[in-house]
Swiss-Prot record:
PROSITE patterns: BMC_1 (PS01139), BMC_2 (PS51930)
Function: The only hexameric shell protein in this bacterium, it forms the majority of the bacterial microcompartment (BMC) shell. Expression of 5 proteins in E.coli (BMC-H (Hoch_5815), BMC-P (Hoch_5814), and 3 BMC-T (Hoch_5812, Hoch_5816, Hoch_3341)) forms a 40 nm artificial BMC with a molecular mass of 6.5 MDa. There are 60 BMC-H hexamers per BMC. The shell facets are 20-30 Angstroms thick (a single hexamer layer), with 1 of BMC-T trimers protruding to the exterior.
Localization per Swiss-Prot or TrEMBL: Bacterial microcompartment
Similarity field: Belongs to the bacterial microcompartments protein family.
GO CC terms in record: bacterial microcompartment
One Pfam family here: BMC
Family matches, as InterPro entries: Bact_microcomp_CS, BMC_dom, BMC_shell, CcmK-like_sf, CcmK/CsoS1_BMC
Reported effect, residue 28 to A: Forms larger hexamer patches, increases hexamer stacking
Domain BMC, residue spans: 4-88
Keywords on record: Bacterial microcompartment
Protein name: Bacterial microcompartment protein homohexamer
Observed phenotype of the null mutant: Absolutely required for BMC formation; when deleted from an artificial operon (Hoch_5815, Hoch_5812, Hoch_3341, Hoch_5816, Hoch_4425, Hoch_4426, Hoch_5814) being expressed in E.coli, no BMC shells are made.
Application in biotechnology: Artificial BMCs can be made in E.coli by expressing (Hoch_5815, Hoch_5812, Hoch_3341, Hoch_5816, Hoch_4425, Hoch_4426, Hoch_5814) or (BMC-H (Hoch_5815), BMC-P (Hoch_5814), and 3 BMC-T (Hoch_5812, Hoch_5816, Hoch_3341)). Cargo proteins can be targeted to this BMC. Artificial BMCs can be made by duplicating this gene with a 16 residue linker between the copies (making an artificial BMC-T). The shell assembles into balls with holes where the pentameric subunit would be, and can be used as a model to study assembly and permeability.
Amino acid sequence: MADALGMIEVRGFVGMVEAADAMVKAAKVELIGYEKTGGGYVTAVVRGDVAAVKAATEAGQRAAERVGEVVAVHVIPRPHVNVDAALPLGRTPGMDKSA
């Protein structure tokens, strides 16, 4: 099973909560956290199978647009291990899910 990282950046905390709720309800993904980036921008981050993360971010975008402003939506399929080493977003570097 391929792993992916999905992010939705919105303006405002309520929009982020709405997006996060929709993402975890829409597909089998794990909400691994959120990041406040300043200026009212907040990013929700999910992990899971590539197809599930794509479906989740699409659902999250639709939900967040109903209550706020979506700034960006992005999915990184199979992020390189160095991404986890530099930005430990819910994974321990070197961790193999199939083990």
